[in-house]
């Protein structure tokens, strides 16, 4: 597949995170750098690097690694509190990683329409054109295990 990034969509418990982690495990086994973050954690890191002042080198390093790692996994996009900062940082992250030719996996419960409405046309346009969109279907497997 020429598209190096993936968007997994689907209901809760249909295997989006599991598949993301399977891909991560294989890439780590092949010595690629992989960062897994929930969307909330990623935006917290980006906010820390932006607003903690110039003295927080660790926060800046963590934010830089989000952009530079071979594979970034953003889990549960759409569960974070959305605001202008979040939307701008999501655009920056997606766009910058595309420019650097770095792969990203995003998992979300949001449909493409909801994704566009929640964030922006600029973000959804890049995802639609540059990501393999893989919808997952099925019941919540967590409730079947219990």
Residue map of PLM features:
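Short, basic, helix/turn surface patches
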Residues: 61-70, 130-138
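Walker A/P-loop nucleotide-binding motif
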Residues: 3-20
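Loop/turn-to-beta-strand initiation segments
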Residues: 32-33, 68-71, 100-106
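Short glycine-rich substrate-engagement loop in P-loop NTPases that contacts/grips substrate
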Residues: 3, 28, 32-68
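Histidine- and/or cysteine-centered catalytic micro-motif in compact active-site loops
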Residues: 7, 11, 39-42, 77
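P-loop NTPase Walker A phosphate-binding motif
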Residues: 18-30
């Amino acid at each position: 597949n020429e598209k190096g990034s993936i968007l997994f969509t689907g209901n809760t418990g249909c295997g989006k995170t599991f598949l993301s982690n399977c891909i991560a495990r294989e890439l780590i086994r092949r010595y690629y750098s992989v960062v897994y973050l929930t969307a909330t954690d990623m935006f917290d890191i980006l906010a820390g690097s932006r607003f903690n002042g110039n003295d927080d080198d660790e926060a800046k390093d963590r934010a830089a690694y989000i952009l530079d790692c071979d594979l970034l996994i953003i889990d549960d996009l759409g569960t974070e509190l959305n605001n202008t900062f979040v939307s701008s940082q999501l655009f920056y992250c997606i766009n910058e990683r595309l420019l650097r030719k770095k792969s990203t996996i995003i998992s979300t419960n949001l449909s493409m329409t909801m994704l566009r409405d929640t964030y922006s046309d600029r973000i959804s346009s890049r995802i639609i054109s540059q990501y393999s969109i893989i919808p997952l279907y099925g019941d919540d497997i967590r409730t079947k295990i219990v």
